[in-house]
UniProtKB/Swiss-Prot annotation:
The gene is GASA14. Its main location: secreted. The keyword Secreted applies. This is Gibberellin-regulated protein 14. Residues 36-207 have a biased composition (Pro residues). Gibberellin-regulated protein that may function in hormonal controlled steps of development such as seed germination, flowering and seed maturation.
Length: 275
């Protein structure tokens, strides 16, 4: 950057010097022009020759002040910081330290402590009473009187008695009776048990037809009324209601009344989706 500025300044200075020299040469050429000599007429009349003055130059070249050219300032070379090197001192060998001689400890035998004889108090033993076992009287088994079997009597044989025939009495002669004609037996058909009249099955009221999701909200509100997680039940019920166009009556069961679409709809995990 400094060199480029220096070169531009030198070029400008040389250019101004050249222009100034050219303007000086032009002014010198105008001054040194020869004066024209007119032909002299008759010597009788000589007009006075006017003294010609050199024309003054109408243009003076501008004088530019010469600025002294400063030599480029060179920066001193930057010396890198010198890291002080600490001289490495050789290791000083320390003389070996002599330890004082270790004296073996003097062993003193322990003085035996003489304990006085401990006087034990006389132990009193209570007399052990002699326990006599109770005399158990021998138990006599109960005497049962001997059972005397009754004497066996021989069976008495009775001679057979001859049957006594009753006296034969001749029945009185009855006049012949005319027998009525035999009627064939009448066959009564089996009586069928009378069944009580069965009441026709009561059909639950059919819910109104579902058209939009707004129609499913009141139906699913009654369906999920007793569910522990009502919000989850409502989302699943509204989806099933919108797809199958039906919600089973009641709060539980009766899925077959909405067909296989409602009963067989599964989640991604394979569980039943519709409540």
């Amino acid at each position: 950057m400094a060199l480029s500025l220096l070169s531009v300044f030198i070029f400008f200075h040389v250019f101004t010097n050249v222009v100034f020299a050219a303007s000086n040469e032009e002014s010198n050429a105008l001054v040194s022009l020869p004066t024209p000599t007119l032909p002299s007429p008759s010597p009788a009349t000589k007009p006075p020759s006017p003294a010609l003055k050199p024309p003054t130059p109408s243009y003076k070249p501008p004088t530019l002040p010469t600025t002294p050219i400063k030599p480029p300032t060179t920066k001193p070379p930057v010396k890198p910081p010198t890291i002080p090197v600490t001289p490495v001192k050789p290791p000083v060998s320390t003389p070996p330290i002599k330890l004082p001689p270790v004296q073996p400890p003097t062993y003193k035998p322990p003085t035996p402590t003489v304990k006085p004889p401990s006087v034990q108090p006389p132990t009193y033993k209570p007399p052990t009473p002699t326990v006599k076992p109770p005399t158990t009287s021998p138990v006599k088994p109960p005497t049962t009187p001997p059972v005397q079997s009754p004497p066996v009597q021989p069976p008495t044989y009775k001679p057979p008695t001859s049957p006594v025939k009753p006296p034969t009495t001749t029945p009185p002669v009855k006049p012949p009776t005319t027998t009525p004609p035999v009627q064939p037996p009448t066959y009564n058909p089996p009586t069928t048990p009378v069944k009580p009249p069965t009441a026709p099955p009561v059909k639950p009221p059919t819910p109104p037809p579902v058209r939009t999701r707004i129609d499913c909200v009141p139906l699913c509100g009654t369906r999920c009324g007793q569910h522990s997680r009502k919000n989850v039940c409502m989302r699943a019920c509204v989806t099933c209601c919108y797809r199958c166009k039906c919600v089973p009556p009641g709060t539980y069961g009766n899925k077959e009344k909405c067909g296989s679409c409602y009963a067989n709809m599964k989640t991604r995990g394979g569980k039943s989706k519709c409540p």
